Regions:
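Conserved short alpha-helical segments that host acidic/polar catalytic motifs at enzyme active sites
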Residues: 1-208, 214-271, 277, 366
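Flexible loop/turn segments at secondary-structure boundaries
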Residues: 12-14, 102, 175-177, 196-197, ...
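A glycine-rich phosphate-binding loop feature that marks nucleotide/adenosyl-phosphate handling sites
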Residues: 37-40, 163-165, 276-284, 291, ...
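PRPP-dependent phosphoribosyltransferase catalytic core
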Residues: 164, 200-206, 356-473
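Phosphate/diphosphate-binding loops
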Residues: 195, 202-203, 207-211, 261-267, ...
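Extended, hydrophobic alpha-helical segments in both membrane/secreted and soluble proteins
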Residues: 274, 281-288, 292, 296, ...
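Short, glycine/charge-rich flexible loops or terminal/linker lids adjacent to PRPP-binding catalytic cores
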Residues: 293-339, 377-389
Length: 473
């Protein structure tokens, strides 16, 4: 996915920018970059590969080089960024969190017009460069960003560091978040509000869909009003978000707790304890235990000092190894227990199957599973979710394809239909679980606590208020 952070202050910004960007590290592990601006020295940029190192270890030894009172940072799962640009709009640094489904089309369009693309990453078009080319075609930054909203099929949130402040622009449909923070003499913008607390910022406002603002050290001004409708990615609350973060005023951990509590109150399975698959399954498990009236127990613990999230590595074998090695079952708490596990989602199913087998081998009498979202039946066309680049990576779609029944996807995605029940039972069988239940869309929406029409649920039911064809008309 990726995360953004921007700081502008009356004092040097490097420390706040360093830690603020680091607090977005759970959103990506491929590359990271920082850029700062100082009136006399201009722009300074640094980019590092994160695939074999953490953000802090990459940047802490060179932090003194990032001088100036304003800067932007990015955790990226794709491009090398921020990019430095010199144009008729002036010099600026730009960072994005984007998924551009029509990148090839836009690239060919630019080339046909006599323009050129200078920066490639592993032979892949640099999306941030495409975005910058769209922006510099405007007479000002607002018109340029509106070009992005009009031309890009997918999603794009942007930070632009200029000589006159930081411009922040949220995706046109609000699919990816940006939130403003404030403290004495400084303003911040970030993807994750969890970045604010330890740095002394308080949440000032949630940037709306398509809204554009300019930050200065003493406050911010609106450059473009938000669009009237939004489609916020529901997976922000289910999986991506850090527990202390809030999106649209709704806290991640509270949402997960509410979801688990609702499932616990409705469930009838006989279990001795509830346990969450770390990290994003824990909040749901605590809620489930409260709703069901059974104890929450850490029958599985994550070895946190060195293991990152397992969906990040691009190689499936590496992902499986990371998933296995980072989670350590507690034999003494498993012996003879009927264990109910809670997890955020099931993508491929490989890791969950291995976890269930490990619990049984260490003495669990039964292993039940409850999932914090409905089955993932459709690949996401809007956000770079690293775990499902191809729909056939989804266990649901592999099963449906094996049954040669893809013309009935809507029925498989609808809770309670015969097709849905058959699919869930087949997943349960393949994962060697004693029982398996998914949250319903209704429970998920209620747990999030904002209107359903404001939430993107495409990966669950294939429907979005705005299709790729419609959204830019």
């Amino acid at each position: 996915m990726g995360g953004l952070c921007g700081i502008i202050s009356e004092q040097p910004c490097a420390v706040d920018l360093f830690y603020g960007t680091d607090y977005n590290s759970h959103l990506g592990t491929k590359r990271a970059g920082l850029a700062t601006y100082e009136k006399d020295c201009g722009f300074f940029r640094g980019i590092h590969n994160l695939e074999n190192a953490y953000f802090r270890s990459c940047f802490e030894d060179e932090l003194e080089k990032f001088i100036g009172n304003s800067g932007i940072g990015v955790i990226s799962d794709t491009d090398a960024q921020p990019m430095l640009v010199n144009s008729h709009l002036g010099r600026f640094a730009i960072a994005t969190v984007a998924k551009v489904n029509n990148a090839e089309e836009l690239a060919h369009k630019f080339l046909a017009q006599g323009m050129y693309l200078t920066e490639f990453s592993s032979g892949i078009i640099n999306i941030t460069e495409l975005i910058s080319l769209l922006i510099v075609r405007g007479k000002d930054f607002v018109e340029g960003i509106e070009n992005v909203y009009r031309e890009v099929k997918g999603s794009c949130s942007i930070l632009i560091l200029t000589e006159d402040g930081i411009i922040a622009a949220r995706d046109a449909w609000g699919r990816t978040p940006l939130v403003l923070g404030k403290k004495d003499g400084a303003m911040a913008v970030t993807s994750e509000s969890t970045a604010f607390a330890n740095l002394g910022y308080k949440t000032e406002a949630y940037i709306g869909p398509g809204e554009i603002v300019r930050l200065r050290a003493n406050g911010y001004e609106q450059l473009r009003k938000p669009n009237p409708r939004k489609q916020v990615c529901s997976f922000l609350w289910v999986y991506y978000g850090f527990p202390t973060s809030c999106y649209e005023g709704r806290n991640v951990e509270e949402t997960r707790f509410n979801c688990g509590k609702a499932m616990g109150e409705q469930d009838t399975v006989c279990a001795d304890c509830a346990c969450g698959v770390p990290d994003s399954g824990i909040g749901m498990a605590v809620g489930y235990a409260a709703g069901r009236g059974i104890p929450y127990m850490r029958t599985v613990a994550k070895y946190t000092p060195t293991w990152a999230r397992s969906f990040m590595p691009s190689n499936q074998t590496t992902r499986n190894l990371v998933a296995k090695m980072k989670l350590i079952p507690n034999r003494d708490m498993l012996e003879g227990k009927k264990v109910l596990m809670c997890d955020d989602s099931i993508v491929r199913g490989t890791q969950l199957s291995n976890n269930a087998q490990s619990l049984r081998e260490l003495g669990a009498a039964e292993v039940h599973m409850r999932i914090a979202c409905p089955p993932l039946v459709y690949a996401c066309p809007f956000v770079n979710f690293s775990a499902s680049k191809n729909y056939l990576e989804l266990i649901t779609r592999r099963i449906i394809k094996e049954w040669d029944d893809e013309e009935h996807l809507a029925e498989y995605a609808t809770t309670g239909t015969p097709q849905y029940e058959r699919m869930v039972e087949e997943i349960r069988r393949r994962l060697n679980l004693d029982s398996l239940k998914y949250t319903t869309i209704e429970t998920l929406v209620k747990s999030i606590g904002i209107p359903q029409e404001d939430i993107c649920l495409h990966c669950f039911n294939g429907s979005s208020a705005f299709t790729l064809e419609e959204e830019n008309r």
